[in-house]
Amino acid sequence: DDHDDGANWKASTQVGGNPRGSMSYDDWKSLHFKGEEIIDPSVSGPSVDPDKDGLNNFAEYALGTVPTNNINTIPFPKLLFAQQGEEKYLFIEFTRAQGERDARFLVQTSSDLKDWENKAIQLGPESLDPNGNIITRYRFPDPINEENQTPGFLRLFITD
């Protein structure tokens, strides 16, 4: 098939799909850094935060934000409490740019901030915000119980 002919195109089976496959961290670096910055780990290394916005380069890569501009068009992950049926739950919502990247998003739960498990429950399918970014929502598996006040925590863990 001729991929330059729009008649041969079809909708992606994934929200944010990319016909070229996933973007590597090195490809992303070459888009956002210039010359010596690309090979300087103190500027473009995965754990560095050159724009001082609280997101290191790997998180910026995974979420699709710009590492040299601290005014992000994609909001930071947010925690909120919401009612689901008769119960109240802790939720996390995060947004990322479309396109495949070599990164995984794990929403993890903990009762002590030491031991983390992949037990969060995804709520519905991913959706798109008005800018075309992908929104994903998870909730803590157990409802918030006013009586026993067992602590519960959620975090977004981004890994390769």
State the predicted function of each range.
Residues 1-46:
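Intrinsically disordered, low-complexity linkers and terminal tails enriched in Ser/Thr/Pro/Gly
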Residues 20-27, 58-61, 156:
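Aromatic- and Gly/Pro-enriched helix-to-coil junctions and flexible linker segments
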